[in-house]
């Protein structure tokens, strides 16, 4: 439900409509060229009917950027604002508009409070940053209250490519390496959580890996088994 495309993408795709004419219109008209379903739930449902879709899982683009804000309080404030917006959007039809909230975990009590609020708002999942702030790790038991809150509320954790509390400001020459190695970050998170017993302590915890590819899974599973043996 949120329209926020990087400038490089707007030149290639005009809010979901391919073609040079549409791209030129978006460059000329700005967001006035974007279809109404980008911000109106009523139009979004009509778009689903047009495209033969039963439902959509709605992710944030804004929070992927806001998670890079170093100031913890400001970053969390951005998460709250988005969660309020998303809750209002999905309220139109929660069966067909499935919301995923967003949260940062720098301050564990604040994170637990926001996770519980996300569940009360009717969301089905919560997006956490794949890369935490410097010095923090998903292997740290201090995050157990976060996993407990997520498990108790029935939310699903979404680990989306490109989400970081460590800051992302790569030089142009860095992009090929970052793009080719995007799966490494999610592997690191899963490895930390598996070998430190997070899933043993919270067997109901569910994780979704989003836009991190899947072809690496067989080899990753082999390497994990090899290490465990």
Model region roles, listed by residue range:
Residues 1-229:
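Helix-coil boundary/capping segments in enzymes
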């Amino acid at each position: 439900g949120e329209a926020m495309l990087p400038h490089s993408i707007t030149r290639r795709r005009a809010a979901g409509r391919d073609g040079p004419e549409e791209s030129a219109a978006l460059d000329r008209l700005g967001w006035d060229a974007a279809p109404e379903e980008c911000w109106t739930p009523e139009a979004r449902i009509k778009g689903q009917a047009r495209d033969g879709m039963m439902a959509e899982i709605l992710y944030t683009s804004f929070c992927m950027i806001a998670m890079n804000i170093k100031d913890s309080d400001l970053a969390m404030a951005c998460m709250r604002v988005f969660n309020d917006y998303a809750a209002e959007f999905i309220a139109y039809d929660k069966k067909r508009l499935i919301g995923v909230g967003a949260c940062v975990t720098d301050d564990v009590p604040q994170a637990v409070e926001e996770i519980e609020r996300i569940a009360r708002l009717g969301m089905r999942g919560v997006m956490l940053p794949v890369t935490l702030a410097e010095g923090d790790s998903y292997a740290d038991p201090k995050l157990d209250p976060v996993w407990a809150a997520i498990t108790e509320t029935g939310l699903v954790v979404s680990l989306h490519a490109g989400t970081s509390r460590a800051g992302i400001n790569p030089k142009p020459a860095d992009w090929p390496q970052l793009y080719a190695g995007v799966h490494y970050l999610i592997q690191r998170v899963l490895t930390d959580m598996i070998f430190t017993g997070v899933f043993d302590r919270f067997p109901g915890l569910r994780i979704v890996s989003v836009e991190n590819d899947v072809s690496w899974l067989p080899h990753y599973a082999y390497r994990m088994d090899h290490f465990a043996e």
